[in-house]
Amino acid sequence: MANITPMMQQYLKIKSEYDDCLLFFRLGDFYEMFFDDAKEASRVLEITLTKRDAKKENPIPMCGVPYHSADNYIETLINKGYKVAICEQMEDPKQTKGMVRREVVRIITPGTVMDQNGMDEKKNNYILSFIENEEFGLCYCDVSTGELKVTHFKDTATLLNEITTINPNEIVIKQALSEELKRQINMITETITVREDISDEDYDMNQLTHQLMHDTTQLLLDYIHHTQKRDLSHIEEVIEYAAVDYMKMDYYAKRNLELTESIRLKSKKGTLLWLMDETKTPMGARRLKQWIDRPLINKQQINDRLNIVEEFMDRFIERDTLRNHLNQVYDIERLVGRVSYGNVNARDLIQLKHSISEIPHIKALLNELGAQTTTQFKELEPLDDLLQILEESLVEEPPISIKDGGLFKNGFNAQLDEYLEASKNGKTWLAELQAKERERTGIKSLKISFNKVFGYFIEITRANLNNFQPEAFGYNRKQTLSNAERFITDELKEKEDIILGAEDKAVELEYELFVKLREHIKTYTERLQKQAKIISELDCLQSFAEIAQKYNYVKPTFSDDKVLHLENSRHPVVERVMDYNDYVPNDCHLDDETFIYLITGPNMSGKSTYMRQVAIISIMAQMGAYVPCDSATLPIFDQIFTRIGAADDLVSGKSTFMVEMLEAQKALTYATENSLIIFDEIGRGTSTYDGLALAQAMIEYVAQTSHAKTLFSTHYHELTSLDQMLKCLKNVHVAANEYQGELIFLHKVKDGAVDDSYGIQVAKLADLPNEVIDRAQVILNAFEQKPSYQLSHENTDNQQTVPSYNDFGRTEEEQSVIETHTSNHNYEQATFDLFDGYNQQSEVECQIRELNLSNMTPLEALIKLNELQSQLK
């Protein structure tokens, strides 16, 4: 390393300033990487790792990618969480003596991607920062659209909820995180940058009401400007918001309800977002996800959205016309970002032109729909002046590159027209010269061609060179090929200077004109961003109307007395993936008097789906959308808590039961009377008595403290007696019938409890071996013969009492207990051969077992009983 070259010294100096990035170091037509960067990049990109100075004692690991195809390689690295620093040659090597000056012109990070190919058009690409100082300040930005928002709050739970909702691709912090907080955040993104210094740059944030919000916004904008190193005037003035203005849902609730990502496939398909996305624009699709993540809690704002949806529902033809216009609108938000950023091309501006040309049609259509839409979207503004500029300047199908000419229409610029005319006339002259030379030489295949090395030349194939004397025609030999000779004449050389001079001047002028046009369009940034926001909201609302009409949804109403009444409600996603009309709708009625449903029924009967659909319908309603019911009256929920399904948290080493308890703890701690709690089979991850005790205690706690609307499913049938002690609790069950030993799921929620979970019948549906099914039935029969079964544990007491809810403040008269009696001795289960079948059963027992009592009339039952009695005599 002692004899390191000046170029490598330059590399190492630059690399030391960007040690957390992979440095793409421009050398000619390649971006090269060295040392550890080369090893890492070659592995990730699957490209060859070579060595620089291979013959020396310590060769340097090296790899590289062509500069013209670097974008694809950079995208791969960014998607895997890397940062890439782009180091360009700032001078032309041909015109420089000594070392070429190089500088990092941009740092591309997961949260600052600006190239269209590297982004999903239906997703925001957020970068987020937060600062902790007793409280939290949090700011996030989508650099590609200019969106910038900030908030502050007091607790870590809200921090994690916000990070989950925003789902950033990169996080910037001021100090290192605790291991526990880092672990939780790494579940969302692993790209975390520590940036200790905050500049004193003035970003015009005087309107912010809290110092923490000011500091975290400063931290984020410092980092964005440090990485991008160019104009970012499209980033909007920071908007202050409060997390409490929206319904709260934590990571577990969003995951369990599958709002934007399915649990099994980790994809959009099968989610609420998948169902509701009938948007026509990229901005609308991104706005829809934001609305799903943040349902409203302001009744007036919700009803404003619902009223617009209602107008769209009533006017199908106008809505269909609107959808056609929206379909012609491109991604205005990101096009404006590219204009400001400086990487917009002429085709992008044509997309912008087409987009704003639709605004007058959309506004006229909204005026026809009625006063509500006219008022709601009154700020929709036809940008006629900008449209005229774009219409008069650019050709309809320009090239992708802005440095090759061919961008502008004739008549846009007089000087450009002169250059283009000279170039055009010169090419006409070349065509005439080619015809003249063919006639003069008698060589019909003679042609005049061009390349960047030799300019214009006359080419004659070798077959036509026999007996041909070039000098006689004034031809000077320029190049010899294997099958042809190339010549030039004084006349052609003179004309070449004129033609190429005009072409070069035209291309140079077009580039200058395009830059001026881009800078002019930049002055429309704020107006364009406002139009994009309005169009995105309009797109969401028409999407709500589209799915409502397509799937027969209804307009929800909101009660002031906290009543939840759903008639024939359906799960919006599940019914779409089922065959037509196969979904069984169900009712739900909760109010101040009865706010807990205790739900029993077999596995696979639909308990979890029923609970999920109540939560999802509530979310849809508070988004301002119609809901899948015959009628729906709802309270406005401030929070939704869920505990559904079983999942170990392997990353943190937490068991299924521990995860279950942590989720339950959040609900029990933070729920209010305006919250909704979904508990699915709480307590199943531990022993029977522990689980039963915890489940009962949780129900009693909700009944005595928060009074939150609660749906609680269970297989602990002992809990069904709680309705005698808790007036706020109602037993319901998901019905099923057993017919000839087969279980038939009815999926209908009915009043009352059931005392059988049909576990063995469900196991039979899963095709467990018959020997296991038969053996389980024998054991079950043995258990059911006891007054109350018990497991063989040495610590089983003669009598065990489970306290009721009196511990939470009931008076002596209100106290109750649930007593679980056991025999005077431990029950020792008899042993059987696994492959023994049922105990010997009589024919009468078999007939009784197969009776379908629910479908028999009293008379039929008496006749059957008499028949069985006769057989026993």
From Swiss-Prot:
Any one cellular-component term (Gene Ontology): cytosol
Entry-linked SMART domains: MUTSac, MUTSd
Residues given in the record as ATP binding sites: G601, P602, N603, M604, S605, G606, K607, S608
Organism: Staphylococcus epidermidis (strain ATCC 35984 / DSM 28319 / BCRC 17069 / CCUG 31568 / BM 3577 / RP62A)
Record keywords, A-Z: ATP-binding, DNA damage, DNA repair, DNA-binding, Nucleotide-binding
Protein name (database record): DNA mismatch repair protein MutS
Free-text function comment from the UniProt entry: This protein is involved in the repair of mismatches in DNA. It is possible that it carries out the mismatch recognition step. This protein has a weak ATPase activity.
Signal peptide (UniProt feature, chain positions): none
Transmembrane segments: none
